[in-house]
């Protein structure tokens, strides 16, 4: 067998067959091979139960084989990630006018950087979800209390005056008072429904963030920025003032004496 060449990786040459890489794939140590060549190597190594990189002999796992990347423009191995264009670049791309003023990271640093950003965003959204759920429970409780007060007021109206100081004229004015408050309930209930929908969408976004962070590699690195820029359905600081302006102003008032 021809000795593996260690200096041909940047030129897009497979160290096993010594030809141009075809469907380039890489071991987890980052060396590139033709898919067919590496597959054959893995099949032979499987018999012994030990799989090592054909080039550097570092132990590898068959399950962590990932797609390698060759620059489609220059047929050289990519080595940097451009944050502006979100593209993987080779050494020739780096000196091109298109990318010279851009900020690039090594692929290893980019993976670490974006994984931390994904996890940080996920943690922040989980806190937002918890706060939204707290507000939702708080508003539901207040709405239930208002409904109870209205029902209780109607019951006392039907029962008649409890004392000489509480005339039927006074009691007769109560339904209009409760009806005025009840007019606000559908709109506030709709806001609570909006919170429920926002929580559902935020949970979906958190799942995507955590899955991408866990599986982040060169295959998914280009999509990490798009995911980080995905807007939450509605900012917590927007929803909360709506609640405070509506339901809270109405329900934080002292209970009316009947």
Curated annotation (Swiss-Prot):
Residues annotated as binding Zn(2+):
71, 74, 93, 99
Q: Which GO terms describe its molecular function?
A: ubiquitin protein ligase activity; zinc ion binding
Which reaction does this chain catalyze?
S-ubiquitinyl-[E2 ubiquitin-conjugating enzyme]-L-cysteine + [acceptor protein]-L-lysine = [E2 ubiquitin-conjugating enzyme]-L-cysteine + N(6)-ubiquitinyl-[acceptor protein]-L-lysine
InterPro entries documented for this protein: TRIM/RBCC (IPR050143), Znf_B-box (IPR000315), Znf_C3HC4_RING-type (IPR018957), Znf_RING (IPR001841), Znf_RING/FYVE/PHD (IPR013083), Znf_RING_CS (IPR017907)
**Where do the zinc-finger regions (RING-type) map?**
14-56
Picking any one GO biological process from the record gives: negative regulation of NF-kappaB transcription factor activity
- Fill in the subunit field for this protein: Interacts with NEDD8.
Species per Swiss-Prot/TrEMBL record: Homo sapiens (Human)
Q: Among its keywords, does the record have Kinase? A: no
What does the UniProt record say this protein does? E3 ubiquitin-protein ligase that plays a role in the limitation of the innate immune response. Mediates inhibition of the RLR signaling pathway by ubiquitinating RIGI and IFIH1 receptors, leading to their proteasomal degradation. Also promotes the neddylation of IKBKG/NEMO, stabilizing NFKBIA, and thereby inhibiting of NF-kappa-B nuclear translocation and activation.
Q: Which residues form the B box-type zinc fingers? A: 66-107
Which residue stretches, if any, does this entry annotate as coiled coil? 107-159
| A GO cellular component annotation in the UniProt record | IkappaB kinase complex
Sorted alphabetically, which SMART domains does this protein's record hold?
RING
Q: Does the keyword Hydrolase apply?
A: no
What are the EC numbers? 2.3.2.27
The entry assigns this protein to a family as follows: Belongs to the TRIM/RBCC family.
Q: Which UniProt keywords apply?
A: Coiled coil, Metal-binding, Transferase, Ubl conjugation pathway, Zinc, Zinc-finger
One Pfam match: zf-C3HC4
Give the tissue specificity. Answer: Highly expressed in normal gastrointestinal epithelia but that is down-regulated in gastrointestinal carcinomas and chronic inflammatory lesions of the gastrointestinal tract.
Protein name per its UniProtKB record: E3 ubiquitin ligase TRIM40
Disulphide bridges in this chain? none
């Amino acid at each position: 067998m021809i000795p593996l060449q260690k200096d041909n990786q940047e030129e897009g040459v497979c160290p096993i067959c010594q030809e141009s890489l075809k469907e380039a794939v890489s071991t987890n140590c980052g060396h590139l091979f033709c898919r067919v060549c590496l597959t054959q190597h893995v099949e032979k190594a499987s018999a012994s139960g030990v799989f090592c990189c054909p080039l550097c002999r570092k132990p590898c796992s068959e399950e962590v084989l990932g797609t390698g990347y060759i620059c489609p423009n220059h047929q050289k191995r990519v080595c940097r990630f451009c944050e502006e264009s979100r593209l993987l670049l080779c050494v020739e791309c780096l000196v091109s006018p298109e990318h010279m003023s851009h900020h690039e990271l090594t692929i290893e640093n980019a993976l670490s950087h974006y994984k931390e950003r994904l996890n940080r965003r996920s943690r922040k959204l989980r806190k937002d979800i918890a706060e939204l759920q707290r507000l939702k429970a708080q508003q539901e409780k207040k709405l239930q209390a208002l409904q109870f007060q209205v029902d209780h007021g109607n019951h006392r109206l039907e029962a008649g005056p409890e004392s000489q100081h509480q005339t039927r004229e006074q009691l007769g004015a109560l339904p209009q008072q409760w009806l005025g408050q009840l007019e606000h309930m559908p709109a506030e209930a709709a806001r609570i429904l909006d919170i429920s929908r926002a929580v559902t969408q935020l949970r979906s976004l958190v799942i995507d963030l955590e899955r991408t962070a866990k599986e982040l590699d060169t295959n998914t690195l280009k999509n990490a920025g798009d995911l980080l820029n995905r807007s939450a359905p509605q900012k917590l600081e927007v929803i909360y003032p709506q609640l405070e302006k509506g339901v809270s102003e109405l329900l934080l008032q002292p209970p009316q004496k009947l």
